[in-house]
Amino acid sequence: MSLCFRSNTGDVGPAFYESQGYGWMRGFFGGLVTSCGMIFTGHPEIDQEEENEELGLHGRLSFIPAKNVATECSWEGEDYVVRVRGKMREAVVFGTNLELTREISTVLGEKCLRIHDQIENLSVDPSPLMFVYHSNPGFPLLNLGTRLVINSQQSTEWLEDREVGPEEYQLAQSPQEQAHDDVYIHRPIADKEGNVQVALVNDELKLGIYWEFPIREMPIITQWQ
């Protein structure tokens, strides 16, 4: 059973990336997690501090080919662990030089994927850093009545910048014609270990998915629907 959203663009290769404006949307095929960044995320804008450079939607990262890709499968005690590693670099001559080293791992028999990222600035100059883990749950997990479970100290509606309660954002609605984006900004509460847990639960299917991450690295959750 698929847990993620897949868009109508299909899989799009890096060579077809459109960096300007909302061109990113022409290659956003969905998937369980899409990484956005690394020097910019968000709506397109002009960076007046960098010679009016045009910054396209969500940055370049998701279209940068990975290198040094490797797999490893081995026993670690009683666990059979599968790992996939690779590197991605966002760089320009006389400018940005950021390298992402990623490892995705799982243990045979577990229903869990772990993503470990390390970002290194290989330039002699400081660099901006913006990063989004764009999670894309889809049908049938995401359906009418699917619940978002989140412990938030504050939740606001993005466009109107007004505080909202769970009754407004917690339950998924049915598809609507000519619907606009609904975006909510959550400031989650971490547990004693400093980790945040967020879940999406379909009670009818008895199916769910959850995310766990350190709040010191990801202090804000954006809910887009």
Model-assigned labels for residue ranges:
Residues M1-L108, C112-R114, P126, P137-E177, ...:
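Surface-exposed acidic/polar loop and edge beta-strand patches at domain peripheries
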Residues Q118-S123:
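Asparagine-centered strand-capping/turn motif at beta-strand->loop junctions
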Residues D125-V132:
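Short, hydrophobic/aromatic beta-strand segments
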